[in-house]
Amino acid sequence: LAFDVSTRGSYNMMQAAVTHSINRVINTGPHFVLAGRTYETFDYELNPDIPPQPGTNLYALSKSLGQEICKVFTEGNDVHVLCYLFYSFRDPNQPLVGADLTPFSISWNDAAEAFRLGLEVKLSNLPSRCEIFNIFTDLPHQQFSNEKAKSLLGFSPQDTLSQWWHK
């Protein structure tokens, strides 16, 4: 099922975009499309341009293959792909009970704003036809970096979620 949805689904999505002359696709995936356990456990300032290492998790592998399919389609077709990597969506008004805030957290409103920005960004301003962005709020531990989303999309998260990391 993971390959049918994530890998074949990416192929079908990109084929439909090319067939119907859609020039902008926003694809989504979990952060471990790029940064599996081998990165996540040992590194900091992980940015979306690192070499992909999704690890051995089936879901992460199938999403990573889907991302590669998107990239290949951009190389020979008039289509741009913006891939947004997410992990944990939070309502800033809900208490976080019995768990810590994950390093890749974002409010629903800030996530929605990232999509608006991706739909409005001038495609000629992007470095390539396939760009990957880490989408999360500014967090103090700096395990991951969202600087690329800020600089290329103008992303500026409003919900700090500081009530969960300011204990």
Please give the residue ranges for each predicted region.
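Catalytic helix-loop patch of NAD(P)-dependent Rossmann-fold dehydrogenases
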Residues: 4, 40-75
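Glycine-rich "substrate-gating" loop/helix at the edge of Rossmann-like oxidoreductase active sites
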Residues: 55-59, 97-108, 123
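Conserved Rossmann-fold NAD(P)-dependent oxidoreductase catalytic core, especially the SDR/UDP-sugar
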Residues: 12-53
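Alpha-helical substrate-binding/gating segment
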Residues: 71, 86-92, 105-129
